[in-house]
A protein has these predicted regions:
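Beta-propeller domains
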Residues: 134-181, 185-220
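Acidic/polar, low-complexity intrinsically disordered N-terminal segments immediately downstream
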Residues: 20-164, 473, 481-547
């Protein structure tokens, strides 16, 4: 009986639903969806507080015709900043690598569409740009020139920023300046700090890159809170865990930091770094191929005391936290790599190394290097090319591939023993196959593609320092003895821009850098004092990627 009743109920329910008439009024239409593209000239835009951030988004409509009833809302780091389609915003919020987002509301449908790009806004000084160390009126001075991309003119040039912030001169006898960082994960500060080496005053100083306040003095970080006897600081280079204090005579003293999350922990020992098992042969640190790469686990050094290239280890195991640092390791080269007459990397006797630099990021954490060497018997100059694997913390010699040695014809007229020479190697050799070499006030360009040396530019004073910026290697900064600082463009150019290939290499012309306007001069200012060192400071990351 219950079964019959159940069937009857189901049958009645079917009849009722079958007789129901849906009188709803539905309108079906195709959605005009919006695809939003938010792009800027640089892939990793970086701004300082007070900068004007502009962006013209690209809106693509699914039906090919733009909707008219739209609302716009821009936000950065979760803060609403504008309600216009095209953004023009004075940056007022400090944030690192946060989304600059555009939300577009179609009021006809109630649907909101989104597009974004990640940007960084930092303090006035915690930004990408050039650092200039110079000597003016007998004092060491630091200047900061903010310059994010290689196409635009630098937006801020702050002179003698150390004295302006700290209220007193930095010191005397400037020697060098190098940036250093803490870990990207929970480090003391995102911005890099600067080790400034100088002979007088307080000696070598550590300065915050975001405020330019003095943070430490090198002498106080030695075990005895004073320099070892005879030590005169020429450079301080901080790696992940290992720190190098390099003397004017090339002697290296080391410190092993307790963590890479803080800028200064641990103390320098008074025993010099050595390369032999007995600890008797001191490593000479006068020529180090300085790079900003933690994955290489150290730095390459040419040690003239042992006449060989060495890898100074700085290995950190990020899983276990284990460190293996502070050893000067030889390179392991297959003898079959060499041709007859090639100088061997672990036996450079009878050769003088004038320069060694990192040329590009290789594959599988290898690093490519180029060195300018001179055969002291024949007087001929050569370009050495070799690739070094990353140090894994266990190897006793670092595997290395010797690539080639080619004669640099004509370089003997540039490096003659009496002229002042500076060097700058473009990191991104695939697109900028150049090495810049100066002789007094003349700048030369060595073109890797045809192994030829070209006169490139003439200045009104001797060149004292050069450096190439990292953003696509677009610019070369040149510091002069008379206090001028010049940024040359044209290394890698946008369409229609001046180009070194066309003007110098193909045209046979030499750029004349004077006070007059010049298509190749992006920036030219005077009165910085005698320039000691210039370099491009990439603000917020250890790893300097070669774009």
């Amino acid at each position: 009986m219950k079964i019959h009743t159940l069937f009857a109920a189901i049958f009645l329910l079917f009849i009722v639903t079958a007789c129901y008439e849906d009188k709803g009024n539905y309108e079906y239409r195709e959605m005009n969806d919006i695809e939003i593209t938010v792009e800027m000239e640089d892939k990793h835009p970086s701004y300082a507080l007070g900068d004007v951030v502009t962006c013209t988004p690209k809106l693509t409509f699914a039906l090919g015709q733009e909707s008219t009833n739209l609302d716009y809302e821009w936000s950065f780091a979760g803060k609403k900043i504008s309600h216009t389609r095209n953004l023009e915003w004075v940056a007022d919020t400090v944030a690192n690598d946060k989304a600059l987002q555009l939300a577009v509301l179609d009021k006809n449908t109630g649907v909101t569409y989104f597009g974004h790009i990640y940007i960084t806004v930092s303090s006035k000084y915690a930004a990408d740009g050039w650092v200039v160390l110079s000597e003016k009126d007998g004092n060491s001075t630091l200047a900061f020139i903010r310059h994010v991309s290689g196409f635009n003119t630098p937006s801020v040039a702050v002179r003698d920023v150390y004295q302006m912030i700290n209220g007193h001169p930095m010191g005397t006898g400037p020697m060098s300046v190098y940036p250093h960082w803490t870990s990207s994960w929970g480090g003391e500060e995102e911005a890099s700090w600067l080790w400034v080496a100088q002979k007088g005053g307080q000696g070598a100083l550590d300065v915050s890159g975001s405020t330019y306040q003095q943070k430490a003095t090198l002498s106080q970080i030695f075990l005895k809170q004073t320099y070892p006897e005879g030590f005169v600081p020429a450079a301080v280079m901080d790696l992940q865990i290992l720190s190098l204090a390099i003397g004017e005579d090339g002697t290296i003293y080391t410190r092993v930091k307790e963590t890479n999350k803080l800028f200064n922990t641990g103390r320098f020992i008074d025993r010099p770094l050595t390369s032999d098992a007995k600890g008797e042969v001191k490593v000479d640190g006068s020529m180090i191929a300085y790079t900003r790469f933690d994955y290489q686990a150290g730095l390459l050094c040419y040690d003239k005391n042992s006449a060989q290239y060495l890898h100074i280890g700085d290995y950190v195991d990020y899983d276990s936290g284990e460190t293996r640092v502070g050893k000067a390791l030889p390179l392991k080269v297959d003898e079959g790599d060499y041709k007859e007459g090639d100088a061997k990397l672990n036996d450079m006797r009878n050769h003088k190394v004038h320069f060694v630099g990192a040329s590009s990021k290789g594959t599988d954490f290898t690093m490519s290097y180029m060195a300018v060497i001179e055969n002291q018997t024949t007087g001929k100059f050569y370009l050495q090319k070799f690739t070094v694997e990353a140090y894994d913390g266990k190897m006793s010699a670092v595997p290395t591939k010797f690539e080639s040695q080619e004669e640099m014809v004509g370089l003997g007229n540039v490096i003659n023993g009496s002229a002042k020479n500076s060097f700058a190697l473009c990191n991104y050799q695939e697109q900028a196959p150049y090495m810049f070499i100066s002789k007094d006030n003349m700048l030369y360009l060595y073109y890797m593609s045809n192994s030829t040396l070209y006169p490139c530019a003439q200045f009104e004073s001797n060149i004292t320092s050069m450096n190439v910026n990292i953003y696509y290697n677009r610019c070369l900064m040149v510091g002069l003895e008379n206090g001028d600082v010049v940024i040359l463009k044209g290394i890698r150019s946008a369409d229609g821009e001046p180009n070194l290939d066309r003007y110098v290499i193909n045209g046979g012309n030499t750029i004349q850098v004077t006070d007059a306007e010049n298509d190749f001069v992006l920036f030219h200012e005077k009165d910085f004092g005698r320039v000691v060192q210039v370099f491009y400071r990439w603000n917020m990351s250890w790893n300097e990627y070669f774009y």
